[in-house]
Amino acid sequence: MAKNSMVERDRKRRKLAQKYSAKRERLKAIIESPESSVEERFEAQLKLQQIPRNASPVRQRNRCAKSGRPRGYYRKFGLARNELRRAAMNGEIPGLTLSSW
């Protein structure tokens, strides 16, 4: 089980990223646009710097939905490897069978 503080920190980052995503995209479009003037770009960069760092989607960490484990994460299932194995053994994931030889 992951530390609750780390899981909550990641939840906070996801919430902030969602909140500022539209504003962030607008500012990045102005910065990358060849039609915008130098002053507009500079002003957009300053506004982008005012957005909290945790609002950046890059700072998010994929975590297991059950245990919060950050490593061994399978995107397709949203689970860490050990939770995925446990769920597969119990037959909780349709169509997934563990191989044995």
UniProtKB/Swiss-Prot annotation:
Q: Where does the chain cross the membrane?
A: none
* Keyword match RNA-binding: yes
What protein family is recorded? Belongs to the universal ribosomal protein uS14 family.
One term under GO cellular component: cytoplasm
- Cite a single GO MF annotation: rRNA binding
Q: Region Disordered: which residues?
A: 1-20
Stretches of Basic and acidic residues bias are at: 1-10
> Which keywords does UniProt give here?
Ribonucleoprotein, Ribosomal protein, RNA-binding, rRNA-binding
Q: Which GO terms describe its biological process?
A: translation
InterPro entries, sorted? Ribosomal_uS14, Ribosomal_uS14_bac/plastid
Q: Which Gene3D superfamilies match?
A: 1.10.287.1480
> Which Pfam families does the record cross-reference, listed alphabetically?
Ribosomal_S14 (PF00253)
SUPFAM superfamilies associated with the record: Glucocorticoid receptor-like (DNA-binding domain) (SSF57716)
Supply the HAMAP family for this chain: Ribosomal_uS14_1
Subunit text: Part of the 30S ribosomal subunit. Contacts proteins S3 and S10.
Q: What is this protein called?
A: Small ribosomal subunit protein uS14
Q: Does the keyword Iron-sulfur apply?
A: no
